[in-house]
């Protein structure tokens, strides 16, 4: 009863915040990055709780190694802290978003390709070029992940970097076009299929759709077009979930699990509630630590790009500590990794104080990309890195981190020069 009451209050507050942000995304002349972040938090942290009451609490018979999540999901104190945590973050995002909405000219949405067009167009087709010159093109006649295609890790890393760079440049080129016709829409459709096929993973489709959405809302001024997307976006999200179900049941089924259940695997993929409750339960109820010392994996998150050869005692990535705790296996012997979340990462590092710290850190991170002189490319990168902080592991997105650092340095230099010239 207490769990249901806590969840109901959390869902009521968060649904109101998400509804306001969703409406503001489409009906304000300028879309703030924070509103899309609110929707992502709601999808990953609140929707799974709704599914607990409408579809059922997962038993994890499919992914049986996640049965360790169940005690935390049933513990009243853990659920109470989780609900407080999510409400705290959502309200922080709401108040920040409301203050930003009062300033309708705080970012620059105009992006002129100019002299960069030829290099960006080359970057768009870079993944195909790499496939051809590497001799791996025949391996891509099937839709599968890198393991099924027999690709080595080095090539997969390079190919992923090229895919991310390609997607970034394509999004800027496509939505930087003032007049988009049906021919342009066809190109968008074909391009998305091609990168999805090359990647062989579902996350690239979700990433592409989110980047397209943000770029569209940042550049499209036609109210009718924005209103149409406002109405059909939930259908597109449902289609993405259906594609994920198809992928897990047809493309990459788990043959080594019992009583295969697509719903449970979707919960594992899209939900971050269970893993966050797991961390809260381990630390707050059982008194067990996930990391070795406070701030350890925050440090590894920020400095992940430093090679271990240079820093031998460098902490591992957070997902490795998390997975080690879940599987009770040493980090050096992990068979795979559990997808992390900024929510549980901050709690794992700082305990209860990590809840307000994460809310503040998320706001500060968003604000970095919402300042007055932030251009469309930097805002787009900021969005992706916010999503990574919320739902992924940072090491896969090295190319975006490098691009972000370059653009932030460029913005700082430009701002300093403008100050000197005006003084």
Regions found by a protein language model. Give the residues of each.
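Long extracytoplasmic/lumenal interhelical loops at the membrane interface
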Residues: 293-353
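Central hydrophobic cores of alpha-helical transmembrane segments
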Residues: 36-42, 184-194, 232-239, 359-364, ...
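Aromatic-rich transmembrane-lumenal/periplasmic boundary elements in polytopic membrane proteins
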Residues: 226-317
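Hydrophobic, aromatic-rich transmembrane alpha-helices
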Residues: 14-25, 166-176, 357-369
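N-terminal "leader" segments that precede or initiate the main folded domain
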Residues: 1-105, 188-193, 216-241, 419-423
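Membrane-interfacial loop-to-transmembrane alpha-helix junctions, especially the N-terminal start
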Residues: 28-42, 114-120, 180-187, 369-381
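Hydrophobic alpha-helical segments
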Residues: 168, 335-423
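Membrane-embedded catalytic interface detector for glycan/lipid assembly enzymes
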Residues: 59-80, 94-222, 239-253, 325-327
């Amino acid at each position: 009863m207490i769990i249901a009451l806590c969840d109901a209050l959390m869902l009521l507050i968060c649904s109101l915040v998400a509804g306001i942000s969703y409406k503001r995304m489409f009906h304000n002349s300028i879309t703030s990055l924070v509103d899309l972040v609110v929707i992502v938090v709601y999808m990953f942290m609140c929707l799974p709780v709704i599914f607990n009451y409408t579809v059922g609490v997962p038993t994890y018979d499919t992914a049986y190694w996640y049965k360790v999540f169940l005690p935390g999901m049933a513990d009243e104190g853990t659920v109470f802290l989780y609900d407080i945590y999510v409400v705290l973050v959502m309200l922080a995002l709401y108040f920040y978003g409301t203050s930003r909405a009062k300033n309708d000219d705080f970012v620059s949405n105009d992006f002129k390709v100019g002299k960069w067009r030829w290099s960006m167009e080359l970057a768009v087709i870079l993944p195909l070029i790499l496939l051809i010159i590497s001799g791996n093109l025949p391996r891509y006649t099937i839709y599968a992940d890198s393991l099924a295609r027999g690709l080595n890790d080095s090539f997969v890393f390079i190919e992923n970097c090229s895919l991310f760079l390609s997607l970034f440049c394509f999004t800027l080129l496509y939505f930087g076009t003032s007049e988009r016709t049906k021919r342009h829409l066809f190109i968008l459709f074909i391009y998305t299929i091609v990168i999805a096929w090359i990647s062989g993973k579902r996350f690239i489709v979700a990433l592409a759709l989110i980047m397209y959405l943000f770029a569209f809302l940042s550049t499209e001024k036609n109210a009718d077009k924005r209103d149409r997307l406002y109405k059909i976006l939930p259908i597109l999200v449902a289609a993405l979930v259906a594609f994920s179900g198809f992928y897990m049941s047809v493309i990459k089924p788990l043959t080594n699990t019992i009583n295969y259940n697509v719903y449970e695997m979707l919960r594992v993929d899209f939900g971050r509630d269970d893993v966050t409750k797991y961390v809260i339960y381990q630390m707050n109820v059982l008194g067990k630590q996930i990391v070795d010392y406070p701030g350890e994996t925050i440090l590894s998150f920020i400095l992940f790009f430093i090679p271990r050869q240079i820093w031998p005692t460098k902490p591992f990535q957070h997902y490795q500590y998390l997975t080690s705790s879940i599987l009770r296996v040493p980090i050096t012997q992990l068979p795979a990794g559990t997808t992390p979340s900024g929510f549980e990462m901050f709690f794992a590092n700082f305990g209860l104080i990590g809840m307000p710290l994460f809310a503040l850190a998320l706001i500060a991170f968003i604000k970095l990309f919402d300042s007055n002189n932030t251009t469309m490319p930097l805002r787009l990168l900021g969005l992706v890195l916010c999503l990574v902080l919320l739902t992924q592991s940072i090491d896969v997105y090295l190319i975006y981190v490098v691009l972000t650092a370059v653009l932030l340095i460029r913005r700082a230099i430009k701002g300093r020069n403008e100050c000197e010239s005006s003084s």
